[in-house]
Amino acid sequence: MNRGVVIAGSLTGLAILAGWLAARAPATAVSRDPAPSAEDVVKLRTLSMILLSRNDNDPRLDKDFNELSPGAKALFRGMYGKLPPERRNERGTIVYLLGRNLASAEDWAFLASVAGEPPCLSLADCSKDAPTAEGHLGDEVTLAYPSLVALKSAEAALTAGDARIRTKARSVVEAGRTSKMPAVLRLSGRLEAEL
């Protein structure tokens, strides 16, 4: 079966499951994330369709995901966690959208966790080294894409005037300094030097 069809089915299934869970599951005291609203589920479905289309220039990315609610952000973080690690572009897109909507401790913790993720060694299988032909700079950046996007979001926050936001952004940079990915180490090192 075509790998793209399998991935498309998986993303669609995730969006349907999220909608079903949002409609059925009550919010519990243990969950820090609020139950997603119907609007949150629509945003997740829209994101799923954009990711399926593989269109990084879809104008909805710049207009439909501003001011995400806590419920939508929780759904997006859930989708990120369910995507295979090899889906670097899709995962990076989710980090990009969440990085534009930083408000809560969970938002910053998510960015820090992405910045410090284990390395993805190959687009075919993150757990296995790539053949030597794949090891040029472009692939190095692609393999580190979600972490680099997290660091760029932190970089934008570092320019903010609010000391509390800068402190939170520093935690993302510090997480990037623990990475084993050369591109992430370079960017986090540059950001750390600028602090």
Protein language model annotation of sequence segments:
Residues T28-P36, R170-L195:
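Eukaryotic acidic, Ser/Thr-rich intrinsically disordered low-complexity regions
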Residues A38, I50-S53, G81-R87, G116-L121, ...:
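Short coil turns that connect the paired helices of HEAT/ARM alpha-solenoid repeats
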Residues L148-M181:
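Extended amphipathic secondary-structure runs
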